[in-house]
Amino acid sequence: MSASPSSTEPGIAGAASGGASARVQAVQAPVIPIVAGWIRETPGTISLGQGVVSYGPPREAIASLASFGGELADHRYGPVEGLPRLVARLEGKLRDENGLDVARGSRVVVTAGGNMAFLNAVLAIADPGDEIILPVPFYFNHDMAIVLAGCRTVPVATRPDYQLDLDALAAAITPRTRAIVTVSPNNPSGAVYPESALRAVNDLCRARGLFHIHDEAYEYFTYDEPHVSPGAFAGAAGHTISMWSLSKAFGFASWRIGYMTIPEALFDAVNKIQDTNLICPAAVSQHAALAALEVGRPYCDAHVRVLAQVRTLVYSRLATLGDLVEAPDARGAFYVLLRVRTALDPYVLAERLIREHKVATIPGPAFGLTSGCSLRLSYGALAPDTVAEGIDRLVAGLGTILRATA
């Protein structure tokens, strides 16, 4: 049975002899490929692991590709920050849906997905050795980007319901702190932060001279809770960096289109970073994104209504485990972050669930949860009937394993 993966302590000799840099070795091993390897070795596994949706792009986005490629300009490098017509369309979307007027001190930059937007932000605002505060549980790619940039992740525990602990966030600030990160709706917990909490974080960042980085990739995936964009708060433009992705809302995961709003003062820095790493977002993906945005939010909303029903089923099945697990109510995204009452290592439990019960989840340590045993399950990637079968396997597997090890 595999042990929990950990960073390798690099040495000078290792780097000098052709090994990876100390900076890269310090980054946590990506968890998705680890779990994917176990799944490949166990045919027939139902994956409640990776955070993707079960649907693809709107047919209008695919149909739009027929009109792409006929002009020589379609095959040239485009603007670093994205095609002007897509940037303009996003500015309208942000104004109409998020209440964010980018004309008041912000700029829009199109990126190759939300992860690039986050790395752009970190590289633009932080120097090696600087600190960035991540509420725990955190999205593992955020931690990976911070460490890759030579900075330090400062994990701060959330409350038992995975809501922000504002006092703890304030107490974690040091002279090296550059930003506080929030993700709402949250990956991995599914928590939706209320306006009061996000406003408090935004005000704290402004008062202490920090940036507020806010990830809104799951903005449409809420269940009876409003979504809030801190960038729309009065006075927020100068210190707020927000980011979005088309991967979830429009089924665009492989097309790699995201976007970010940044203070005007950071525009040149972000463009320099993106020009170095990407040159420009792929024109064909931007072309399809324009068509998807014309279809708009109703496309995603129809799928969210189905997910709401699946969510109800997931919680009802998990309830049959009684006090073996705790599943805090998640009002957003398509995740449940289970606390499992066991002394088993989370990676060991996750691997056993795959090999013995053919159902995959993601171990909690990938999200910064270093005490206890937690598993994240995703119910967004599969058809409702398949999710039901996967949850039944998970419930049966947890019941069998936990009762045998009690």
Whereabouts are the PLM-identified features?
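PLP-dependent enzyme catalytic core of the Aspartate aminotransferase-like
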Residues: 2-8, 355-361, 368-406
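Conserved core segment of the aminotransferase class I/II
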Residues: 5-14, 238-308, 317, 398
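N-terminal small-domain helix-loop-helix segment of the aminotransferase-like
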Residues: 6-15, 21-112, 120, 292-295, ...
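Helix C-cap/helix->beta junction micro-motif
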Residues: 42, 149, 207-208, 357
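Conserved core of the PLP fold type I
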Residues: 74-203, 220-234, 392, 402-405
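A short helix->loop->beta-strand "cap" motif at the edges of active sites that frequently abuts
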Residues: 151, 207-210, 236-238
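Walker B catalytic acidic pair
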Residues: 216
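Conserved glycine-rich beta-strand-loop-beta hairpin in the small C-terminal domain of fold type I
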Residues: 290, 306-315, 327-339, 371
